[in-house]
Amino acid sequence: MRHILIWFVRGYQRFISPLFPPTCRYYPTCSTYMVQALSKHGALKGSLMGLARILRCQPFVRGGIDPVPDHFTLKRNTAAEAAYRQAMQLDEIERHPHK
């Protein structure tokens, strides 16, 4: 079942998504998140995680980095985003040490 769902998402990515401008507020995109969630967590949990992500992807949310977590959850992966932001701040400090 998981492979069939991934096949449908890949079809969307290839044939439907290019017809519209990019609107996803997250990285990875919602469709890529769905494929990764299906691959990592199976058909049922992966579908639920992907649908929860799509529902979070709306204009009133700031978006950002939101990778698929290693454990099942319907919430945003805030730990990964915080680690990414901290790494980017350290990188910025190293590039501009006199700020």
From Swiss-Prot:
Compartment(s) where it occurs, according to its Swiss-Prot or TrEMBL record: Cell membrane
Any one GO cellular component localisation term in the record: plasma membrane
Chief location bin: membrane
Membrane topology of this protein: Peripheral membrane protein
SMART domains for this protein: Haemolytic
Key words, A-Z: Cell membrane, Membrane
Pfam family, one: YidD
Family membership: Belongs to the UPF0161 family.
Cited PANTHER family: MEMBRANE PROTEIN INSERTION EFFICIENCY FACTOR-RELATED (PTHR33383:SF1)
Purpose: Could be involved in insertion of integral membrane proteins into the membrane.
Name of the featured protein: Putative membrane protein insertion efficiency factor
Originating organism: Levilactobacillus brevis (strain ATCC 367 / BCRC 12310 / CIP 105137 / JCM 1170 / LMG 11437 / NCIMB 947 / NCTC 947)
